[in-house]
């Protein structure tokens, strides 16, 4: 080897041939060590260039290479001379038709480069270093022909490089640079060679001669000399590295290259004066020439291993590495440094770390025969990594071309295998029909359709998000193309098509999203292509899934409608939508529609419990229930919440779920509701502000309160806290009044929520709504079941309250002989309610009255003996009346006889003694009925009857005696009798004057809800004073002063005849009237017969003024 010189003229004729080979290799090959995504192509079988008809090749050694280059011809086994053809193989899977077209273009481009003889010697690339890789069959080790002069050759070459100059660099014989790696030339072989097959799969086990030689030789020592020789001449145009000439300048899918490493292939020698990494045709290992000896000495004894091409991938793979090639894309001259920086940052973010980033991952202790471990190498190569990372660009091989062993490649690079997926919703997504949850009807229908072959051309899946619509469409696609011929459930999961589906590589499924950019245009383009296709018979189904189809424009729907009119066989469309209203009716009527309902909370909890068990998550059972409740029927949302909670790194509890979702716990809501209903204003405001300060949403809290109240009313709520178990929240302990309060609160919350959504200050109005819950009407004033009830209560004056209180203390009793004369029922069975003290229930307890069956009685007799309940009911009914005039009328003349129940309706019988009073009371039946219903809280029918005069007077006398007796026995704290009589007198005179005076009702403002008489009367109809005794005697027998008598009674003949019985007596002893304020305008014919009497003389004798006295009538 010492005889060979660079300037040897006998070797100059090989330079041009080698230049073309270098250019081809540099354009087609790529250094596997400069990209972290490179993998050992042990099972790869895809070619960059289409191979010839014969796939058999023969590996030539370096000696054969030197002998073959002068003639530029190669010979096959048959001894015939053939044209030299150099093919560059990329060990990947078979390519598609479009890729094959590119491969043919690349083949013609490569052949054109080989036949180009016009290029001069200025085109120099870094393939001088043995850029052509060798292919070797591992089954036959004898095929590798060792050359014994490699070591000598490398030594002599190192010395020659040190003495060469820049001018002589261009004349250096290129074939001397290939001794370190060996160049293999592939040529055609016959089909009978046993070492290689004609199938698509290339040999599965191959090894690089470079690595074999590195194992057999002391590579580190020889290569270190190359590095030392390189560092002596930094301005040299040649680089003598120990690695093959592979590219550090890679191509991305768009052909854009880094301007620092990429340039025109036709540039000349003017580039040789720059840094070798900045050569526009540079394809070196990545180490710049400005690396000094000092930098190399820092690496110690392994300075020869500084080439970035020997990355961690090389050291792990060992001798099973083959250099691949990448498709040459169209080159662009325009690019920017900022673009490359962004691309580099993007690759770093994705985990694409070039060179020796993973050098610390040692697998055995030493690296390629060097006496240093991987950890030492990773430390030494740190500076190289930084330099190479800033200069390398390109695209990961796994994204450019896929191999047949793609699933293993994705597993190594963190692909889409279940073990590497982080999202629980994707990891546990349904893959078969039986894994779909909550959609039993849809699953059964689709399974039967696949089994019977009755598949529709268009399906429409409608339902909320997260219910399994897209997963069902994918499973349907796999089931249609499953190769299982038995009656097993499809998809089976183990045939080839099902395997591709489970790996996400199904060729028969196309998913389009109308919500994405240009999604609608893609759907329209697809339909346009399908409409132009001729009908053809196919064995496989093509399934097109259109997600968010309600976003498609009208013209796309028209295209789909045309497809439905003339559908193609084996083509199925699955339209998925969450808004069925925006899908045209014509489309809905022409497709099979499946409704995906919300998943039940119980099914969600079962699924979450299984996931938590598989993932070893510590979750409370109540927390899973709360997650399912807040998921709102979406299984995907529930799985997402569970994943978020699992990232907290602690036990998943109910409080943690509430904090994540942003809702208030039920315990706090119960406490707030109880405070609001109890009318505790201060505590309600304080508690509400505490919850709002924690970040709770007022609208959400209002919805929670409404849901809580509905659960309590329905009896479906179970209090978790013991202190609420016996409270009013328990449905069994709720009274009718409590239910009414809850219903009223629910109504207020529903109305306030509508106003709260449009309010700007939601917190304030939320608290105001809570305060309204405590101001609800009491159960006694709750109106139930009558269209005639009134909504407001009139204010009560002191006179009414005092009289009622006095009557309640006096213990009035009805007469023992009081009974209705006749109560007739035609054809109805009457059930009488006897309200005696022994047989009636307390009506104040808001319960219905007990009834007794009496199927034989057509009339009823009420014994009023000791009937305190009847009196209490009647007093309460009178108190409920809004008109003071009506109150006085009922209290003075009315009497509650009985309450009967006829066919479920209560009938109250009210008796009056006079026909005129009865007629007047009948005009106020609605008000009387309303007041009685408010007391009894039942629908009541009021019937007014007329009692005989004798019975009424006897009842009055009995009541008067009772009042007189009780007034003396209960002296002390009782109200004075005279004061009560004076107040009643003033009130009745005022009422009578208002009713009689013309226009007084128009001038005076009536009371609230006062019911005035509807008819005008000429005579004055005043109330009788039946409660107070007219004659009261003390123990000495003296008669008390007489009470004033109503003028209407004085003009009543019946009253005059029975005056003695009633206890009325004229003050003067004469039956004359003072005519002052007397409404008896008619002159009596008897007045002319009165003699010797005058008003003045009478007044003078009586020495006092009497407003009302007996009218001037002759005494009998």
UniProtKB/Swiss-Prot annotation:
Pfam family, one: DNA_pol3_delta2
Binding of Zn(2+), residues: 482, 492, 495, 498
Residues annotated to bind ATP: 463-470
Assigned GO CC terms: DNA polymerase III complex; plasma membrane
CDD domains: AAA, HLD_clamp_pol_III_gamma_tau
Motif PEST 2, residue range(s) on this chain: 402-422
Gene3D superfamilies according to UniProt: 1.10.8.60, 1.20.272.10, P-loop containing nucleotide triphosphate hydrolases
Ranges of biased composition (kind: Polar residues): 778-793
An individual GO BP term: DNA replication
Keywords, sorted A to Z: ATP-binding, Coiled coil, Metal-binding, Nucleotide-binding, Repeat, Zinc
Disordered as annotated region, ranges: 95-138, 225-244, 777-798
Membrane-crossing segments per the record: none
Coiled coil ranges: 726-760
MF terms in GO: ATP binding; ATP hydrolysis activity; DNA binding; DNA-directed DNA polymerase activity; metal ion binding
PANTHER family per record: PROTEIN STICHEL-LIKE 1, REPLICATION FACTOR C / DNA POLYMERASE III GAMMA-TAU SUBUNIT
Family as reported in the entry's similarity comment: Belongs to the DnaX/STICHEL family.
Note on domains (UniProt): PEST motif is known to mediate rapid protein degradation.
Name of the protein: Protein STICHEL-like 1
């Amino acid at each position: 080897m010492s005889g060979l010189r660079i300037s040897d003229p006998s070797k100059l004729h090989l330079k041009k041939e080698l230049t073309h080979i270098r250019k081809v290799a540099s354009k087609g090959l790529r250094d596997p060590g400069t990209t972290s995504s490179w993998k050992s192509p042990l099972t790869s079988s895809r070619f960059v260039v289409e191979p010839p008809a014969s796939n058999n090749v023969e590996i030539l050694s370096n000696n054969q290479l030197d002998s073959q280059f002068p003639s530029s011809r190669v010979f096959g086994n048959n001894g015939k001379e053939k044209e030299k053809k150099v093919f560059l193989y990329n060990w990947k899977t078979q390519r598609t038709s479009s890729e094959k077209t590119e491969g043919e273009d690349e083949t013609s481009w490569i052949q054109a480069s080989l036949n180009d003889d016009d290029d001069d010697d200025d085109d120099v690339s870094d393939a001088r270093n043995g850029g052509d890789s060798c292919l070797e069959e591992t089954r036959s080790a004898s095929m590798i022909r060792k050359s014994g002069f490699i070591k000598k050759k490398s030594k002599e070459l190192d010395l020659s490089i040190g003495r060469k100059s820049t001018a002589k660099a261009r004349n250096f014989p290129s074939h001397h640079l290939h001794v370190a790696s060996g160049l293999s030339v592939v040529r055609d072989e016959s089909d009978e060679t046993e070492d290689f097959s004609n199938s698509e799969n290339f040999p599965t086990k191959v090894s690089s001669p470079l690595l074999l030689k590195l194992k057999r030789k002391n590579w580190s020592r020889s290569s270190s000399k190359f590095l030392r020789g390189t560092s002596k001449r930094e301005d040299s145009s040649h680089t003598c590295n120990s690695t093959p000439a592979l590219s550090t300048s890679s191509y991305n899918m768009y052909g854009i290259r880094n301007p620092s490493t990429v340039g025109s292939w036709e540039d000349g020698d003017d580039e040789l004066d720059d840094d070798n990494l900045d050569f526009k045709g540079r394809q070196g290992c990545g180490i710049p020439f400005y690396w000094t000896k000092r930098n190399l000495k820092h690496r110690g004894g392994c300075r020869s291993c500084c080439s970035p091409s020997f990355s961690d991938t090389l050291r792990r793979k060992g001798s099973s590495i083959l250099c691949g090639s990448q498709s040459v894309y169209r080159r662009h001259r325009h690019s920017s440094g900022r673009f490359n920086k962004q691309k580099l940052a993007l690759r770093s973010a994705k985990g694409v770390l070039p060179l020796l980033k993973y050098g610390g991952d040692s697998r055995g202790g030493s690296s390629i025969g060097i006496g240093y471990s991987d950890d030492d190498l990773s430390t030494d190569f740190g500076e190289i990594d930084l330099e190479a990372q800033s200069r390398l660009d390109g695209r990961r091989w796994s994204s450019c071309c896929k191999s047949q062993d793609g699933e293993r490649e994705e597993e190594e690079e963190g692909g889409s295998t279940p073990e590497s997926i982080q999202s629980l919703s994707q990891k546990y997504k349904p893959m078969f029909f039986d894994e779909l949850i909550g959609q039993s009807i849809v699953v059964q229908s689709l399974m039967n359709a696949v089994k019977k072959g009755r598949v529709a051309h268009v399906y429409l899946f409608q339902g909320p998000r997260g219910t399994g619509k897209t997963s069902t469409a994918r499973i349907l696609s796999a089931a249609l193309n499953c190769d299982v011929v038995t009656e097993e459930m499809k998809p089976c999961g183990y045939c080839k098509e099902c395997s591709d589906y489970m790996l996400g590589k199904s060729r028969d499924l196309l998913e389009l999203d109308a919500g994405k950019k240009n999604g609608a245009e893609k759907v329209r383009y697809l339909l346009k292509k399908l409409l132009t296709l001729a009908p053809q018979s196919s064995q496989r189904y093509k399934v097109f899934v259109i997600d968010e189809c309600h976003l498609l424009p009208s013209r796309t729907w028209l295209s789909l409608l045309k497809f439905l009119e003339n559908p193609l066989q084996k083509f199925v469309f699955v339209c998925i939508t969450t808004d069925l209203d925006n899908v045209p009716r014509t489309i809905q009527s022409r497709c099979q529609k499946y409704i995906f309902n919300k998943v039940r909370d119980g099914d969600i909890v079962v699924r979450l419990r299984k996931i938590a068990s598989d993932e070893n998550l510590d979750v409370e059972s109540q927390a899973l229930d709360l997650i399912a409740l807040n998921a709102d029927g979406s299984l995907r949302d529930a799985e997402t919440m569970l994943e978020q909670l699992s990232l907290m790194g602690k036990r998943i509890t109910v409080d943690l779920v509430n904090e994540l979702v942003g809702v208030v716990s039920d315990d706090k809501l119960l406490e707030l509701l109880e405070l609001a209903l109890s009318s505790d204003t201060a505590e309600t405001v304080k508690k509400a502000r505490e919850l709002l300060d924690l970040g709770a949403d007022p609208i959400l809290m209002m919805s929670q309160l409404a849901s809580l109240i509905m659960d309590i009313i329905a009896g479906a709520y179970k209090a978790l806290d013991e202190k609420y178990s016996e409270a009013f929240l328990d449905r069994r302990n709720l009274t009718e009044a409590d239910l009414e309060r809850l219903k009223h609160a629910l109504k207020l919350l529903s109305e306030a929520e509508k106003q709260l959504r449009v309010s700007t200050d939601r917190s304030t109005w939320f608290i105001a709504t809570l305060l309204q819950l405590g101001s609800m009407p009491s159960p006694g004033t709750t109106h139930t079941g009558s269209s005639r009830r009134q909504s407001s209560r009139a204010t009560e004056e002191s006179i009414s309250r005092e009289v009622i209180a006095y009557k309640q203390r006096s213990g009035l009793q009805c007469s023992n002989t009081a009974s209705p004369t006749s109560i007739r029922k035609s054809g109805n069975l009457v059930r009488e309610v006897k309200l005696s003290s022994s047989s009636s229930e307390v009506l104040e307890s808001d319960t219905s009255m007990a009834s007794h069956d009496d199927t034989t009685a057509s009339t009823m007799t009420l014994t009023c003996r000791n009937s305190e309940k009847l009196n209490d009911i009647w007093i309460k009914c009178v108190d409920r009346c809004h008109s003071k005039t009506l109150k006085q009328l009922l209290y003075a003349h009315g009497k509650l006889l009985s309450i009967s129940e006829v066919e479920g309706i209560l009938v109250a019988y009210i008796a009056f003694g006079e026909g005129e009073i009865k007629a007047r009371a009948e005009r106020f039946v609605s008000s009387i009925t309303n007041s009685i219903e408010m007391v009894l809280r039942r629908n009541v029918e009021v019937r007014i009857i007329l009692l005989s005069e004798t019975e009424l007077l006897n009842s009055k006398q009995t009541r008067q005696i009772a009042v007189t007796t009780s007034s003396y026995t209960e002296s002390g704290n009782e109200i004075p009798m005279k004061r009560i009589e004076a107040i009643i007198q003033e009130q009745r005179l005022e009422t009578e004057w208002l009713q009689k005076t013309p226009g007084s009702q128009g001038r005076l403002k009536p009371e609230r809800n006062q019911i005035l008489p509807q008819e005008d009367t000429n005579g004055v109809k005043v109330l009788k004073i039946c409660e107070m005794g007219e004659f009261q005697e003390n123990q000495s027998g003296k008669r008390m002063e007489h009470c004033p008598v109503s003028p209407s009674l004085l003009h009543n003949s019946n009253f005059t005849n029975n005056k003695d019985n009633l206890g009325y007596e004229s003050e003067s002893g004469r039956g004359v009237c003072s005519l002052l304020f007397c409404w008896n305008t008619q002159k009596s014919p008897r007045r002319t017969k009165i003699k010797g009497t005058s008003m003045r003389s009478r007044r003078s004798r009586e020495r006092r003024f009497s407003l009302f006295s007996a009218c001037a009538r002759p005494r009998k």
